[in-house]
Amino acid sequence: MEGVIVPLITPFKEDHSIDFEALEWLIKFLEEKGVHGIFINSTTGEFTSLSLEERKILAEKGREVTSRTYLVGTGSTSTFEVIELTKHAKEIGADGVVIVSPYYCRLKEDAIFKHFSMVAEKVDIPIILYAIPSCANPISLEVVRKLALEYSNVIGVKASVDSLTYLSGLIEIKEERKDFKVFTGLDQYFLPNLILGGDGGIMACANFVPEIHLEVWNAFKKGNLEKAMNSARKLVKITKIYSIASSFASAVKLAMVARGFPIKPILRPPYMMDGEEVFKKIKEIVS
C-alpha cells in the first residue's frame, strides 16, 4: 500500500441525499488518472454528517465500483460504533480501514490507546491510524509506536499534522517495524514525506488535481527530484484554497466545480458552501 490515495468527497443532490451517480463518475475518473487507492467516508467526505447506515451504504457502493486499493473510514466518538463499522468494512472486502482518533471529548493517552487496541483486537483487518489534531484528540508518537509494535494489523498512520518533527518521528517507527506505512494527509507535505522515507499521501486536493500528485510521485520514484519539486510547488499553491474558504469541504467542492466536474456545490448542514466571491478566488487558483 503506497502512493496517491484519494479521500473522496461525498457528492450530494439538492435534497442533500447522496449522489451515487456522481460518486461513481468520480471514482472512475480518478482510476483513469492512475491513482493508487480510494478512501471513502473520510473527513473530506463529510463523514460526521452521515448516518451510520449511510456510511455503510456508501462503503458498499464504493467497493462495487473501484478495483483499486480500497480504504473505508470507520472513525467515531463511540468505540463500539468503530468496531461495528470496521467489521462491516471487512465484510464488504475493504483492503483496510482508516480510523480517526475520538473527537469532541478530550481524552488521555491511555484512553486513546485503549480505543484503538479494542478495535485491533476485535477485527482482523489492516488499520491505518488517523492523526488530525485540529479536529480530534492528538495521537502521540508513543501511542502510535506502541500500537504499531503490539498489533500486526495496525499497519500505518495518516498524519494530517502540520509538523515535520511529528512526521519524522512517525518514520522513525519504521526502524523498529519495517512494514509500517506513513502517509501524510497534507498536500504540501507529500514530497517531504517521501524524501523522509514515507509511503505516500492521502490528500484532499487529489480529488480535483490527481495528475499533479501523480507527477510528484512518478518523478520521485524515478529519481528526478527537480521535477518532483516543481510539481510539489504547484500543490503548495493549490492549498491556498483552504485559507480562502470558510471550511475544508467547501474549498474542495468549489475547486471541483471550478474545474468543471459534475459535482454539485452542496454540503450537508451544518456546513455551508461559500458564495460567488470565494468561488472566483478559488477558480483563479485551480484553473
Curated annotation (Swiss-Prot):
<feature type="active site" description="Charge relay system">
    <location>
        <position position="104"/>
    </location>
</feature>
<dbReference type="GO" id="GO:0008675">
    <property type="term" value="F:2-dehydro-3-deoxy-phosphogluconate aldolase activity"/>
</dbReference>
<dbReference type="GO" id="GO:0005737">
    <property type="term" value="C:cytoplasm"/>
</dbReference>
<dbReference type="InterPro" id="IPR002220">
    <property type="entry name" value="DapA-like"/>
</dbReference>
<feature type="active site" description="Schiff-base intermediate with substrate">
    <location>
        <position position="158"/>
    </location>
</feature>
<feature type="active site" description="Charge relay system">
    <location>
        <position position="43"/>
    </location>
</feature>
<keyword id="KW-0963">Cytoplasm</keyword>
<keyword id="KW-0456">Lyase</keyword>
<dbReference type="GO" id="GO:0008840">
    <property type="term" value="F:4-hydroxy-tetrahydrodipicolinate synthase activity"/>
</dbReference>
<keyword id="KW-0704">Schiff base</keyword>
<protein>
    <recommendedName>
        <fullName>Uncharacterized DapA-like lyase PH0847</fullName>
        <ecNumber>4.-.-.-</ecNumber>
    </recommendedName>
</protein>
<comment type="subunit">
    <text>Homotetramer.</text>
</comment>
<feature type="active site" description="Proton donor">
    <location>
        <position position="130"/>
    </location>
</feature>
<comment type="similarity">
    <text>Belongs to the DapA family.</text>
</comment>
<dbReference type="Pfam" id="PF00701">
    <property type="entry name" value="DHDPS"/>
</dbReference>
<dbReference type="GO" id="GO:0044281">
    <property type="term" value="P:small molecule metabolic process"/>
</dbReference>
<dbReference type="InterPro" id="IPR013785">
    <property type="entry name" value="Aldolase_TIM"/>
</dbReference>
<dbReference type="InterPro" id="IPR020625">
    <property type="entry name" value="Schiff_base-form_aldolases_AS"/>
</dbReference>
